Amino acid sequence: MREINVSEVTSTVAKLCMDSCYYLPEAVKAKIRAAAETEESPLGKEILNTLIENFELSQKKAVPLCQDTGLTVVFLEIGQEVHFVGGYLYEAIHAGVSKGYVDGYLRKSSVGDPVFDRKNSGDNTPAIIHTKIVPGDKVKMIVCPKGCGSENMGALKMLKPADGVEGIKKFVVDTVRAAGPNPCPPITVGVGIGGNMEQAAILAKYALTRQLGEHNADPRYAALEDELLELVNKTGVGPSGLGGSTTALGVNIEFTHTHIGGMPCAVNLNCHQARRAEAEI
């Protein structure tokens, strides 16, 4: 059994919040640079070059990539041999989010009641936390700030087995086409297939934590990722939704078992700033 004081979790989460909002992952930067070289639309190329200038400035000055620093989504993998001491784990995570957003001068975008009061919490808490227990004595944390422009354009469809792979392709492409400029393309497309209604949605979100360029380990789904990326880019939505050949930088699929009578499919979109930061304790 390994003991970890939750104060270490708090400080780690605070740093990840700031890092994820300031520094774009290298894989994302490489994809945007490559897209700027191959984009067919002159306006689209100009937009992509502006995105490059933006992430270079944010890294140089340690300032947010975007004013929408999102709700904080935390994916936790906790080794079953870990024992947390010094407080409650989730409270420690929320404290880390608060510290990161206050100390990092990040916009606070969380309201407590979604319908009536809609009062801002003032520190971007609470975080949205997904926890998985794994073998070992380590704790892995992935922090993904998620803005609402892209989040609002996600979709879920309870497909039937008879819809098959063609039904999945149509749903994904239709979702991207309907989203248009709203998710700030070029986007990353997270697709969750299987499970039930809520698991498909979580899988789609989790798919966005995978580094751009990393394919699903199953070659069938890896091939589907490539095919979907090609289909999405043929929509012509383009950078900022103003037309062009670069609508998406990547498509990531996660899948799991499901009921014999169903094939749920969820799509979660990231904007061109596929923000993430991770650490292990």
Question: Which sequence ranges carry the predicted segments?
Answer:
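Non-transmembrane, aqueous-exposed alpha-helical and coiled segments at domain scale
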Residues: 1-281
